[in-house]
Amino acid sequence: MARSIKKGPFVDGHLLKKVEAVRGSNDKRPIKTWSRRSTVLPDFIGLTIAVHNGRQHVPVFVTENMVGHKLGEFSLTRTFKGHVADKKAKK
């Protein structure tokens, strides 16, 4: 189910404070966060946010197309190694 419009998008408070601090100081370092559940807001455009994927922080540069999506969508948690080909099919 989608989130109610009257509630508005969810963003963790600590992440919002970090974004406001970076906007004021003009700092170019990525913002580290573990909050994969936070929604990307228009205030985040142009910032690099390092989103944790369970093992490391993946840098994500926020663009206009990402607004409204969750940060976790851009930091993959599973590595796909590929399917193994059938040995019988090769012959």
Swiss-Prot record:
Keywords: Ribonucleoprotein, Ribosomal protein, RNA-binding, rRNA-binding. One of its GO terms (cellular component) is cytoplasm. Pfam families: Ribosomal_S19 (PF00203). One of its GO terms (molecular function) is rRNA binding. GO terms for biological process: ribosomal small subunit assembly; translation. Signal peptide: none annotated. Protein S19 forms a complex with S13 that binds strongly to the 16S ribosomal RNA. Belongs to the universal ribosomal protein uS19 family. This is Small ribosomal subunit protein uS19. It comes from Thiobacillus denitrificans (strain ATCC 25259 / T1). The lineage of its organism: Bacteria, Pseudomonadati, Pseudomonadota, Betaproteobacteria, Nitrosomonadales.
